[in-house]
């Protein structure tokens, strides 16, 4: 969702999940993962439903809230001039409208994602099949910038601490994490792409609309010195930083609208790791999933079914200076 490279690759994260007790680990594909919260949640619920889960558990700042009931009162603010006149962002208008209907003001990051999961469960008519359960987010807020004295920290704080050379072993089960100056490498790749692509090429990229291509082109022509300056030159009230991060990644990977739509129409389950219990579950459910399960990737699969994820993996390795492949010939972790 952040539109930024993960600080360590999916295989190390999958191993950490297995070590922590997970029996099956699947990758949320790029076309659902690098998205706004609503599409992220819709995609996750779609895949988890096909895997026949009975519950989805997520963190929330207000774990006592019934998010399914809250989502059932989703407001429609389209064409509502009372909100339009207040010159607020869509998110602020939406939260205000929801508060008018329910008394709850939706503003915290994890609450918003839990609400998105609830909407996805409702929209896909899964309330009888999947229960949404939330656990309280404690000790660290999503946006916290600094490590605290306990053993729980936000991902933002962990990233920042790593960039400053601090040890974060007590805050994550993944030991020996190394910080890579991904912003500098990401910026160099982006600078080349944005300098050589014309307006038409940028306009054809997924999620580039409302004249955003002009803002982006004007920004790069001002010769920004780094990634942060590039973002500042593009930023406006209309676009969040997360939205801009994602769009710049789409541009870097040259992902067109039709490519993204085609990928979403052909979902799959990418298996990253399993235990014996997980293997037994897959064996019991064999032939009962609608979407294919991919455990081994050859060049043909990489170029076809996994085209976007494969390309993202190649660029990720360049940015993070990883030598091992992310996809070709990689097999699921077994425990």
Label the model's feature ranges.
Residues 8, 16, 275:
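Functionally constrained cores in energy, signaling, and assembly domains
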Residues 1-13:
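N-terminal catalytic cores of NTP/NDP-binding nucleotidyl/phosphoryl-transfer enzymes
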Residues 15, 19-29:
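A glycine-rich helix N-cap at a beta->alpha junction
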Residues 1-3, 23, 31:
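N-terminal capping/interface segment
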Residues 11-16, 86-90:
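Short low-complexity stretches enriched in small and charged residues
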Residues 28-335:
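Active-site cores that bind ATP or allylic diphosphates and position pyrophosphate for catalysis
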């Amino acid at each position: 969702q952040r539109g930024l490279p993960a600080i360590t690759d999916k295989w190390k994260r999958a191993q950490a999940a297995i070590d922590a007790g997970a029996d099956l680990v699947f990758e949320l594909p790029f076309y659902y993962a690098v998205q706004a919260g609503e599409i992220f949640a819709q995609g996750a619920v779609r895949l988890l439903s096909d895997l026949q889960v009975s519950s989805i558990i997520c963190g929330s700042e207000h774990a006592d809230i019934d998010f399914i009931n809250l989502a059932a009162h989703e407001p429609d603010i389209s064409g509502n001039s009372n909100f339009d006149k207040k010159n607020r962002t869509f998110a602020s208008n939406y939260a205000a409208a929801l508060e008018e209907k329910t008394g709850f003001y939706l503003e915290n990051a994890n609450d918003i994602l839990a609400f998105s999961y609830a909407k996805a469960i409702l929209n896909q008519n899964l309330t009888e099949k999947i229960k949404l359960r939330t656990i309280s987010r404690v000790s660290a807020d999503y946006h916290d910038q600094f490590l605290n004295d306990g053993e729980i920290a936000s991902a933002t704080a962990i990233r920042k601490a790593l960039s400053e050379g601090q040890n974060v072993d007590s805050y994550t089960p993944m030991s020996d994490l190394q910080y890579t100056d991904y912003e500098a490498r990401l910026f160099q790749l982006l600078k080349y792409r944005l300098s050589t692509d014309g307006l038409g090429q940028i306009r054809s990229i997924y999620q580039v609309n409302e004249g955003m291509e002009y803002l982006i082109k004007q920004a790069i022509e001002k010769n920004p010195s780094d990634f942060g300056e590039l973002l500042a030159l593009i930023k406006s009230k209309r676009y969040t930083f997360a939205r801009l991060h994602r769009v710049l990644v789409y541009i870097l990977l040259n992902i067109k609208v039709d490519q993204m739509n085609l990928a979403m129409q052909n979902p799959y389950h990418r298996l990253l790791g399993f235990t014996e219990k997980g293997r037994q579950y897959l064996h019991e459910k064999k032939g009962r999933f609608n979407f294919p399960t991919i455990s081994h990737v050859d060049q043909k699969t990489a170029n076809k079914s996994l085209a976007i994820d494969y390309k993202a993996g190649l660029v990720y390795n360049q940015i993070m200076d990883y030598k091992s492949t992310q996809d070709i010939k990689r097999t699921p972790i077994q425990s």
